[in-house]
């Protein structure tokens, strides 16, 4: 299968970038990583001593889901989605939930079970001020959770690759905790075609 994808690999440590055709990464024997110096590094379970933490982002329709699905099939790889983590952290009984409930107590955004009605919440946070307030609570909590998972997995020493997909990977400075950032690039015409399906 030929994927029309490109990966912009950026080392979170050095900031060096490299554009590569991602189809060359999609092999069954091992994951290949293009290092900042241009060399290819095998990322199979046998060659890695320390867990590698990779952050993935890219535009809508770029092919992130396909890549994440592929990575999930590999031994020693765990995939996390920042959006799913945020939803979990906003459930009743969590610290985030209580802070948000205090902040939006006057708003009609609650389901009968006390959870947020996401559609109503989206209309309330349409203003920059309220959206920034919500993000100021949720985003730090998500990053803290992810950092805890990464630290735990490193200590356990079982996982070889931890992958995080996050829309705001760069804006939220995940380079502070990821070893590498991967930006998935696909031509605009292909992205539009995918979104029309």
Where in this protein do the model-derived segments appear?
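Short beta-strand-centered segment that lines the nucleotide-binding/catalytic pocket of NTP-utilizing
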Residues: 77-90
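ATP-binding Walker
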Residues: 62
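Walker A/P-loop
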Residues: 65
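ATP-dependent small-molecule kinase phosphotransfer cores
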Residues: 87-158
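P-loop (Walker A) phosphate-binding loop of NTP-binding proteins
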Residues: 59
């Amino acid at each position: 299968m030929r994927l029309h994808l490109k990966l912009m690999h950026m080392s979170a440590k050095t900031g060096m970038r490299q554009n590569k055709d991602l189809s060359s990464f999609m092999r069954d024997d091992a994951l290949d990583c293009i290092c900042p110096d241009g060399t290819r590094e095998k990322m199979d379970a046998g060659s890695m001593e320390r867990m590698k933490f990779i952050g993935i982002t890219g535009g809508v329709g770029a092919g992130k889901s396909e890549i994440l699905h592929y990575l999930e099939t590999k031994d020693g790889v765990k995939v996390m989605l920042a959006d799913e983590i945020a939803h979990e952290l906003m459930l009743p009984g969590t610290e985030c939930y209580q802070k948000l409930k205090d902040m939006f107590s006057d708003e009609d955004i609650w389901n009968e079970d006390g959870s947020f009605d996401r559609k109503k919440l989206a209309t309330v946070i349409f203003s920059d001020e309220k959206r920034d307030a919500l993000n100021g609570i949720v985003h730090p909590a998500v990053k803290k959770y992810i950092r805890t998972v990464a630290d735990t997995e490193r200590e356990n020493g079982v996982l070889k690759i931890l992958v995080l997909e996050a829309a705001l990977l760069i804006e939220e400075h995940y380079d502070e905790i990821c070893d590498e950032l991967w930006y998935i690039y696909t031509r605009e015409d292909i992205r539009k075609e995918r979104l029309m399906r």
